Amino acid sequence: MSTGTEKITINIPGMSNQEIKSSLISIYDKINKPPTKEVGYDLFLKLVHKNLYAPSQMNFIINHVSEFITPLEPKEKDPCMKLLSLIFYSPSSEEESIDSKIYFPYLSPVLTTLQNLIKDSNSTIFPTISNVFAEIVQNIMPTDIEASNIELEQEEKTAYEMMQGFCIYNMKYDDKSNRIVGSLCLTKLVENCPVVLQKQYMKLIWEVIMNLIDKKNFNAKYELLNCLISLILGAENLFTPYAHNTLYKVLDFLADTDWLKRKLALNVIYTLIFYCKDEILPLKEHIISFLRALKTDKVKEVREVCLLILKIFSENEPKNKENTKDKNKSNFSSINNSKKKK
């Protein structure tokens, strides 16, 4: 997001609460009008950066935004919730760059706001909550997420653990809304966190997913399967030690009455074959025994993935690994964007 060409000025100790309140009211008005929405976001960024080094003022901003968003209707909440992620936005230019660690003290109150929004909102706002969460992860985690040799500072690890804790707490909570949002957010965390953190916490995340998949009354398994796919795609061949147990957990979903779950289970198997083929291919006859019925599944998307897996088995392995890898990620991107079951 553009913040203009002016250099950001940091004022210490910051603006008065009355000045902040007046600015926020003007910003809310602009955000709720499409023609001035981006202007409102830019003004909010400048407001945050003016008060960034004044914790009491920053907490006042967070509390005011939280109290403003909570009573809004879902359609009104959507554009305003982006303010919660903009709190952590650092300009990309070297001239205006801000050390991401300065944002860490504000992570806890913002996550508390998201937690309250789960309780006070209906399901239409859940994707927005997860998208805001993803933007927060992107804004405060190291930008080079593919680097496996970077050393994270303790503050960065603590911030990650706080966000991971938010996800797992909601996934284990005895309410469908929390479970859905927790699973959606964990998917975003896995997709946007540095590789070094994926390696460190993969076993913990995998165990959480496996334990919840086992629970018959866990009513967010569509989101959970999506999360599992993202975990495998992020880990790639490092997922090998977990391949066998994962396979046996998802095979039961191939007989599920929900076609979306059947399709996602097939996607998990397809991803496992690609990244952990030495573990999975010896079990192909066992897997095929589950796939036979799906060759004539009434849902086209299910049949297509089933036939693709059978084709891979018949060839024993992908002919062109690099091309298959690109196609694999493209297929899952389109599949996961399919209409979700309500």
What is each residue range found by the language model?
Residues 2-22, 35, 39, 286-342:
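Eukaryotic acidic, Ser/Thr-rich intrinsically disordered low-complexity regions
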Residues 12, 47-57, 87-106, 123, ...:
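Flexible helix-coil junctions and inter-repeat linker/turn elements that act as hinges
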Residues 5, 9-28, 37-40, 54-66, ...:
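Core helices of alpha-solenoid repeat scaffolds
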Residues 32-33, 72-73, 121-122, 174-175, ...:
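Short inter-helical turns and helix N-cap capping residues of alpha-solenoid HEAT/ARM repeat scaffolds
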Residues 27, 43-50, 65-69, 80-94, ...:
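Hydrophobic residues within the alpha-helices of tandem HEAT/HEAT-like
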Residues 60-63, 68, 73, 123:
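N-terminal interaction modules that seed assembly of large macromolecular complexes
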